[in-house]
């Protein structure tokens, strides 16, 4: 099978970690008789340096023409003072919007080999952590109208948080369908005791839940969710929520596993086109030092195979290869402890690729 992948290596450690994912994908091609064609596009700070914008129109067109997009990371202190309209992160919002990527899937799974790396007590993580946060990506306060006015001599800033019924319904369907493939439970997170947008969210979710009688459904307020993720994360299967709540909760959930470097994510459209990236940032402090953990990016590539290319066997092979590397005691610096074998970013990629 031939597939075209647009590669956005980005800034900081982005090029290093993406190179390891491609190393693994190349082995998949050899083992399963596929052909992946890679097209590189500058994004973020490196694009600002070259072209004055975080992504060019030509680069965006290449993303839209691809079968899937693989992203490293964007941003860094170097670009903190550029105009807000051309900040590196603006490219991500633009790609999500242009590609219609409305659903962000962030699995949080504690690798048993790393259970002692979790900041939670063994009595909590002993029950296992295997949850999926489904976050709405193209609506809410991040895409609402915003303005700064002067009222009675002082500045007043306003951000609008807007959701329509169809936006809530389509992200809800992603969550319910995901739950059917997992443990069959959906928790919808909102702030319906305060926000009108959350009351609409809850009403639409209740109606949608009637179409999925085989899925156990519950409502939970966002502040209680933040607490329950620490108190008893094993209670959750699929969590679905709006853009800002999902942004915050998914970062909280990522640390339950002990390292943000392990976690992948997928941003999906209504077609098979998606963008796949690790959840961590560009880590400019270790860029170019071969110290980054490529596992989150490699697992993101596995999600790409599963969700965009319908290559479940190939995705399983990557996940088994990652588990074997951990079983064999290999650790990058962020997850290293005495008694294990410390390896660099490139070597970890090579080890995982060789396990396929």
Regions found by a protein language model. Give the residues of each.
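Generic N-terminal amphipathic, Lys/Arg-enriched alpha-helix
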Residues: 1-12, 39-41, 332-336
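Glycine-rich phosphate/diphosphate-binding loop of Rossmann-like nucleotide-binding domains
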Residues: 6-23, 27-29, 151-223, 235
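Buried hydrophobic positions in well-ordered alpha/beta secondary-structure cores of metabolic enzymes
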Residues: 11-14, 67, 134, 175, ...
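N-terminal beta-loop-helix "entrance" segment that forms/cooperates
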Residues: 33-57, 227-229
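Glycine-rich phosphate/nucleotide-binding loop
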Residues: 45-48, 230-330
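N-terminal glycine-rich phosphate/adenylate-binding segment common to multiple enzyme folds
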Residues: 49-158, 244
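Short acidic loop-to-helix transition motifs that present clustered carboxylates
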Residues: 113, 220-227
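Glycine-rich phosphate/pyrophosphate-binding loop and the adjoining helix
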Residues: 138-139, 143-182, 186-188, 192-194, ...
């Amino acid at each position: 099978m031939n597939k075209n992948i647009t590669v956005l290596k980005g800034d900081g450690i982005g090029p290093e970690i993406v190179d390891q994912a491609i190393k693994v994908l190349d082995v998949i091609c050899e083992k399963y008789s596929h052909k992946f064609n890679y097209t590189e596009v500058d994004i973020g700070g490196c694009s600002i340096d070259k072209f004055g914008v975080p992504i060019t129109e030509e680069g965006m067109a290449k993303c839209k023409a691809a079968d899937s997009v693989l992203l490293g990371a964007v941003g860094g202190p170097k670009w903190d003072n550029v105009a807000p309209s051309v900040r590196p992160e603006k490219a991500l919002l633009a790609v999500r919007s242009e590609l219609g990527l409305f659903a962000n899937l962030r699995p949080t799974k504690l690798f048993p080999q790393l259970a002692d790396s979790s900041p939670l007590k063994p009595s909590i993580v002993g029950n296992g952590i295997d949850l999926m946060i489904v976050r709405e990506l193209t609506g809410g306060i991040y895409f609402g109208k915003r303005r700064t006015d002067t009222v009675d001599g002082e500045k007043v800033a306003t951000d609008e948080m807007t959701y329509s019924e169809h936006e809530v319904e389509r992200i809800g369907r992603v969550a319910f369908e995901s739950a059917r493939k997992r443990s069959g439970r959906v928790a919808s997170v909102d702030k319906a005791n305060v926000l009108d947008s959350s009351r609409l969210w809850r009403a639409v979710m209740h109606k949608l839940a009637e179409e999925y009688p085989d899925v156990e459904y519950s409502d939970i307020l966002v502040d209680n969710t933040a607490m329950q993720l620490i108190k008893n994360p094993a209670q959750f299967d699929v969590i679905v929520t709006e853009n800002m709540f999902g942004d915050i909760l998914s970062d909280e959930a990522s640390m339950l596993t002990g390292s943000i470097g392990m976690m992948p994510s997928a941003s999906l459209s209504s077609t098979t086109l998606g963008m796949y990236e690790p959840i961590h940032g560009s880590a400019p402090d270790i860029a170019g030092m071969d110290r980054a953990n490529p596992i989150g990016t490699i697992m993101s590539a596995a999600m790409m195979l599963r969700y965009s290319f319908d290559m479940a066997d190939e995705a399983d092979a990557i996940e088994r290869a990652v588990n074997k590397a951990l079983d064999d005691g290999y650790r990058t610096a962020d997850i290293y402890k005495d008694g294990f074998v410390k390896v660099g970013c490139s070597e970890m990629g090579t080890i995982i690729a060789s396990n396929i």
